Amino acid sequence: MAEKLQNLELSSEELDRFTKAFQDPKFREMFVQYAEEIRDPENRRKYEQEISQMESERGMDIKFIHPKPGYVLLTSVNGVQKCYLNICSNDLLQKPECKPGKDGEGKAGLHWSLPYSLSAGREDLGKDGSKHVIYDVVFHPDTLHIASKNEKFKMIVDSTSLEAVASQFDVKLDKANVRTLSMKYKGVPNPSVLRKPLLGTTPKHGDPEDPLSFPYPYDVPTAVGKEKKDQKRVIKEEHKQHVTTSEQDPDIQIATTPNYTVRHRSYVDLQDFRDSRDSTPSPVPKELVITVDLPLLNSAESVNLHIAGKNLSLESEKPAYKLNVKLPYVVEDNQGKAQFNKARRQLIITVPVIQHNILTLMQDHFEEARGEKDLRGAESSVLHEEYTDNGSRTSACGTENKLEPLISCLNEEENNSEGLTSESNLDTGAPYLPEISPNQNTLDREEVVYGLTEDVPSMPSDTLVCPTFSCSQDPTSLTLIAHVRDIDENSISTDVGSNHYHIRCSVKQSTSSYDLLVTFLPHDIINPNEVYVNISENNALIGLTKSPESVGFWKMLYFGVSGQPLQERRFVSEDNINEVLACSIPLSQVSPSTQEHQPLIEVLEMTDERTHIRINKPKTECVVSAEHKEHCTDHSEHERDVGVERSNIAVGDTTEHYSNQVSPCRENTELDRDHTSERYEEPESTSCTGESTSDQQQKDSNLVFPGDSSAENKMACLKSSEQTTQESDLAEDDMPDRSDHTQNFDSRPASSSVLKEIGKKDGSVQVISDHTTQCPFQFQNSLLFDLD
């Protein structure tokens, strides 16, 4: 009633007039008499006769249909409130008719025609104060008589009533939870009107200037209006033909999905509004409030509710309700609560949301990753590498590979001005990177990769191409961008698992097909339900969501074509960088003297597009013998003693004899590995204390060079040493830019590409000018390759 009064739109003056009128005793007496006249049946009969006479003057024949009680159907409308359908009867309606016919399967039967009349829905209040809607559906008495004798015919009458109300008043009725009540009629009976045009009569048009003439509230039926109604009826019949058999068959009881709402609830905390970086209010709510509308339910005793993680399921047999909801956040099901509101027939479920601390999850993930990394390192050291006594390594598969030092040599250059050849003896203490045989590599990849792709369906790989893609990640998601143009969206097929993602597609106006299989480590799990693919003109974007137990930065992935060996790809992270640096220079295989002279490598920045490192020169102390210790004094400069000698042989010569005498302030680091005859020498940078410049020059003049001991050679060597010392003492700010550095990099006299090998039997020296080595990892940046 309150809503109807609001629709009146009364002004304040009109309300005052009504208030004063009802305060007058005479007005109240007249109002009571008017109400009694309306309720009098005789007065209502006269009222109907007068209305019929006025309608006949307009060319319309009307009949008042007074419904006779039959039985009542209970259901719900729009999933919100109860709905009652009064199945009534009246003699003014046509009798039911039937015709023999066959159904779609060719079975013989009867086609029934059931005329009916509908009345508009009206709201009423129940005993508990809840609102419900009432509709009247009127048939001929013979229709209800047959329905009382035949149960199948009654089901036809019920389904006809439900479809008529739903289509005529554009409402949604719950057909799965229809129940027949024991009462015969619900509410107060209200008559309805049948209006038909009179044949052979001309309607009288009132004078528009007459103050007593009122516009006709109903449309006069015409031929055009009749055609439109026929068209609408045909459209409705065609729509009914597309309805599935399960929806038309009343015997099949399908559970109804109730209406529900999910609300996010949070609490205001003043600590979240401090002037601090960690005081940002969290976007994750504290609680989730799920409200489920169950209008046909009297209590929550027959409801089964189950909550696990992000899934919420609700089931009820009588009435038949079934609801499966995927919540936006993981909730604590043990601390939730549910309440049933009988007045509104609603089930209110409140569950707290698990508040994930991203930093804690990332730290736990990194600790687990380090533990697994140490375990894999211990296993790989036993399974993959076994060294023999003669300096060779035998892999787990039985293949034997010779040791090759990890050395990068520069091309040999001649000093034309001085006629001298600069050479650098290589240090045998340089670390060795053990090779992995091809068989062993395949075995490990089969164990790691193929084990992850057992559930992925195999596809023909002869015509498939792996696309070029880039990947990025954050603690909760991973994004892949496949750089393929003009992808046909209709050709995309995907397969998602807990540890893999597979996509195949083809290109428009081309026969080429692309196939990409991405697999992850067993502890890196993705959520198969939260995957999206966005296709554009230039590429395809694939978004993967990490599971809550795998939140953090992942270490690596494997990619390739399905059915073929996959390639390993590591993410750019601090752990991966440290692991690469640790693997490239294992300290356990380097002598203590060499460890002191190892360069200090500092990675400033490393991304997929750019790598920035800093290599610091170590500060070492001069180690000399006892007979020359007195010559080492304080020295203000950091010098690098480079051995320069005059050679009488060309670059292509294979042997060269030299003296074994060395400088007092020079240290030759030698490593005899596995009792072999190979020896590599490299002069190290030294820092002498307590020695003046003049003393240093005097000592350098006493050096003995192989092949020539003249003063000319001594002075040339001294000049070369001083020049090298000055170049090494340049400050970092005085160094030239990268372009100048790369141009003059190969022209430095202190570097040489000569590699010497001393024979074990005759002591001959073999000069190797062309030398290739093996690198533990590939540099994407050319500067890193040059520095190596």
UniProtKB/Swiss-Prot annotation:
Keyword Cytoplasm: yes
Intrachain disulfide bonds: none
Record keyword Ion transport present: no
Origin: domain of life: Eukaryota
Biased composition (Basic and acidic residues): 225-241, 628-644, 667-682
Biological process terms in GO annotation: axonemal dynein complex assembly; cilium-dependent cell motility; epithelial cilium movement involved in extracellular fluid movement
Protein keywords: Cytoplasm
Polar residues biased stretches: 417-427, 685-701, 744-754
Record Pfam families: PIH1, PIH1_CS
GO CC annotations, alphabetized: cytoplasm; dynein axonemal particle; extracellular region
Subcellular locations according to the entry: Cytoplasm; Dynein axonemal particle
Disordered: annotated segments: 194-249, 415-438, 628-754
Family: Belongs to the PIH1 family. Kintoun subfamily.
Function recorded in the entry: Required for cytoplasmic pre-assembly of axonemal dyneins, thereby playing a central role in motility in cilia and flagella. Involved in pre-assembly of dynein arm complexes in the cytoplasm before intraflagellar transport loads them for the ciliary compartment.
Name used for this protein in its record: Protein kintoun
Native organism taxonomy: Eukaryota, Metazoa, Chordata, Craniata, Vertebrata
Gene: dnaaf2
